[in-house]
């Protein structure tokens, strides 16, 4: 393993172990560091949706500033306004095997450095501000306000994730693999827009619908100006057995997301899980017309086992030197994982039953997870030769990966993935792109 990763991992483990030796467990915590009673499950490590509720009035009256396991908490005396300051950082080490092209692809980088400022104003308006300083590219990832007067119809305005892809909607710090699959190449990330969302029948049905700045597959929007285009986005998700008395079927969900809109201008290329671009349209090809997406999706979690999958179609009208056409790209992915130490698996992340404290025996070793994933992406044959060069651009890519995750504590997570991506060209007889084989190690520190 790369010495840089070993050194950084050892330093974080030592820091974590020292902190644990000085900090009581949750069940032994003193009242001074208890989370306020009305603190949302999503902020205290539960599997609730990404929403923010006000702190209890009783806790707020006893203190207006507190520091506990979920960050720094500022609360007004009436308990109706509060601010939570926390965040996370991810450091990656990526080693590419059998690189025949000679490029220095091996790298060490800070993938994400994201402080989070979120809370509630006057008991009715949630907010979040999340900048990102990772990859030497400072930007604002999220900034929004959400009016929640009606729990079944919350209005959110700002920059946030478009509700389409299941894998993209999962929080970045809860990912099973270091990077998302090929299927997420066809789904937009965070863009400026307005969204109405809510839940029905005691959270059995959840929905989101919104209107966003025109988005590009696999990319983030910016605040500088509105993109040349716009789109309507909608998603519905059903957990039909969430209230069942049988625990094994409660975490089954199925849904579909999609978008319909107009896009013009440049088209982004497609990247492997190692974040190298493997497909590009011709330099003179531009988006010019309707852009639709459809993404059926599902997950199932039972005890330590978890399965997640989705299928994505992105259909885009394009133009190149007076020739117009429609390109319909498709991708799908399936991810499976098991907690070897028996913890509960879930879409909202994993929490170790016992933190890493080797001095207390093997029962205090954190949580260990083994994961497998397969994904593939197909470029429409109509993209060649007018909109992409068949001699250099592949038509098909498939990825298979194996990952091992170690959750030392609720604050520290180590990930090691080995990913293989192979390609097939659009025209038989053309030498395909060289396969990508990459070993990725990541250390995540959250607070």
Language-model segments: residues:
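Hydrophobic helical h-region of N-terminal Sec-dependent signal peptides
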Residues: 8-14
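Bacterial N-terminal signal peptides that target proteins for export
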Residues: 1-7
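N-terminal low-complexity, intrinsically disordered patches enriched in charged
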Residues: 18-20, 96, 167, 318
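Outer-membrane beta-barrel pore domains
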Residues: 24-25, 33, 58, 99-102, ...
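Outer membrane beta-barrel
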Residues: 67-264, 329, 333-362, 367-384
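N-terminal periplasmic/intermembrane-space "pro-region" immediately following the signal or transit peptide
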Residues: 5, 16-90, 340, 344-358, ...
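Glycine/serine-rich loop-strand microenvironments at binding/catalytic pocket rims
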Residues: 22, 26-54, 153, 193-227, ...
């Amino acid at each position: 393993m790369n010495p840089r990763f070993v050194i950084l991992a050892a330093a974080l483990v030592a820091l974590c172990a020292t902190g644990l030796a000085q900090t009581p467990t949750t069940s032994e915590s003193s009242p001074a560091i208890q989370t306020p009673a009305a603190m949302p499950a999503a902020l205290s490590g539960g599997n609730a949706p990404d929403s923010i509720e006000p702190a209890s009035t009783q806790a707020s009256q006893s203190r207006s500033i507190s520091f506990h396991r979920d960050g720094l908490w500022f609360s007004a005396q009436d308990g109706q306004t509060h601010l939570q300051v926390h965040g996370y950082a991810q450091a990656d080490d990526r080693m590419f095997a059998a690189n025949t092209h000679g490029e220095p692809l091996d790298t060490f980088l800070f993938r994400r450095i994201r402080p989070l400022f979120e809370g509630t104003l006057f008991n009715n308006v949630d907010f979040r501000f999340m900048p990102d300083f990772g990859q030497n590219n400072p930007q604002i990832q999220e900034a929004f306000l959400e009016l929640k007067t009606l729990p079944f119809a919350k209005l959110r305005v700002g920059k946030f994730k478009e509700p389409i892809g299941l894998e993209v909607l999962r929080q970045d710090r809860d990912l099973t693999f270091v990077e998302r699959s090929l299927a997420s190449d066809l789904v937009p990330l965070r863009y400026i827009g307005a969204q109405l969302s809510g839940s029905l029948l005691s959270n059995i049905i959840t929905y989101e619908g919104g209107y966003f700045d025109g988005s590009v597959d696999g990319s983030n929007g910016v605040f500088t100006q509105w993109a040349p285009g716009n789109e309507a986005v909608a998603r519905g998700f059903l957990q039909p057995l969430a209230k069942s008395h049988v625990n094994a079927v409660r975490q089954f969900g199925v849904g579909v997301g999609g978008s319909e809109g107009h896009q013009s201008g440049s088209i982004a290329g497609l990247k492997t899980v190692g974040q190298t671009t493997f497909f590009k349209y011709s330099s003179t090809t531009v988006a010019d017309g309707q852009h639709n997406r459809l993404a059926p999706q599902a997950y199932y979690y039972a005890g330590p086992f978890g399965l997640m999958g989705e299928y994505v179609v992105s259909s885009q009208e394009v133009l190149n030197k007076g020739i117009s056409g429609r390109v319909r790209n498709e991708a799908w992915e399936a991810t499976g994982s098991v907690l070897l130490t028996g913890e509960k698996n879930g879409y909202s992340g994993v929490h170790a039953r016992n933190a890493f404290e080797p001095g207390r025996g093997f029962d205090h070793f954190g949580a260990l997870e083994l994961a497998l994933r397969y994904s593939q992406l197909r470029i429409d044959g109509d993209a060649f030769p007018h909109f992409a060069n068949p001699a250099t651009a592949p038509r098909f890519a498939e990825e298979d990966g194996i990952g091992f995750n170690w959750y030392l504590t609720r604050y520290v997570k180590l990930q090691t993935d080995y990913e293989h991506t192979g390609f097939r060209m659009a025209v038989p007889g053309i030498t395909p792109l060289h396969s990508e084989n990459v070993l990725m190690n990541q250390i995540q520190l959250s607070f």
